[in-house]
């Protein structure tokens, strides 16, 4: 075989050109603007809170990486902004000395200025082990007392609010008021905007491909409020109402049963004419995503939700009665500025705190009081107009919040809308 030096001149020129191009190209799989490492890292235990905030930060031009600890990490396997590193996996258990030693070894973190954490809120304290020049942003995703000693973390949050290293925000109106009740302090409002949903889907006209109404949110597999949790009964009443008006009936199906094995993609969900929401918490990412897809959104009236939502108070899921009683004694309602505690189980307290829940904060959630009311609004109202109204509402929210995020990181002039994440 001839040696390289014996090859024809044009081959040598070709090889030299390729070598120069490769040496000047960015790292494989790393966007050119991010090749020198992130300025902000997102890391917590909830894939939903990570995905929407990652998309927002990318939209304003922030070099960002995500290190998810969630069991649902599989939802982001094809997202090159998600990374793995033992430092973030072991952050909670390693000593501060070990964390800073490992941090210093990684040149990719030399530009890091911020870490963002949302769930559970108390996990933000683990990031205090990072060098002190790294600022910490907590955007509370679900109540501050989840996975924490209620009394201890309440006081810790007050201390954080006074510490310039911290920025404390809330991604729901409920969490804003929950924190205000227990601390007397007001976090920054950074509500969920589902920027990870493509611009194409968010701008799409109302064009359902079927007559299947989704029963959600996505994690709901059994609950149908107002219909005794009986899907067959719901579909029978729907067919009867449709026949009365000579209309083709809608069929209701749970999202999880319709789309198994993680097939409930945004594209698939957007094909449906409407969604029947059965709230189990004050807000959930999957609930917000459905609204931000502009799918006509039907929710039981507040009167039907009394004693049906099991994930709005600390007891019994997150704390025992004794722990909650002690918390209420330490932070009595009389000093809170509110008429009721968010952990009060009374009917009056439940009604009061419902005003801060997601479905009562948006403009176009369709509330219904009984089956006939639901079917009248579903069959006889203009769902296309409802979709368009939701679309306008959501577009305004997204535009406003992108500006807030840009200002927070000094990126006011660099907002860019990206159509695909």
Annotated model-derived regions:
Residues 8-20:
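Cleavable N-terminal signal peptides of Sec/SRP-targeted secreted and luminal proteins
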Residues 19, 24-126, 403-420:
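N-terminal pre-catalytic "stem/leader" segment of glycosyltransferase-like enzymes
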Residues 42-48, 68-71, 92-94, 115-122, ...:
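Structural motif
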Residues 118-210, 216-221, 336, 346:
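Catalytic core of nucleotide-activated saccharide and alditol-phosphate transferases
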Residues 178-181, 185, 192-265, 286:
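Conserved catalytic-core segment of nucleotide-activated headgroup transferases in glycan assembly
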Residues 270-279:
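Acidic donor-binding loop of glycosyltransferase active sites
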Residues 279-280, 284-396:
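Catalytic binding pocket for nucleotide-activated donors in carbohydrate/polymer assembly enzymes
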Residues 376-384, 394-421:
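C-terminal alpha-helical cap of glycosyltransferases
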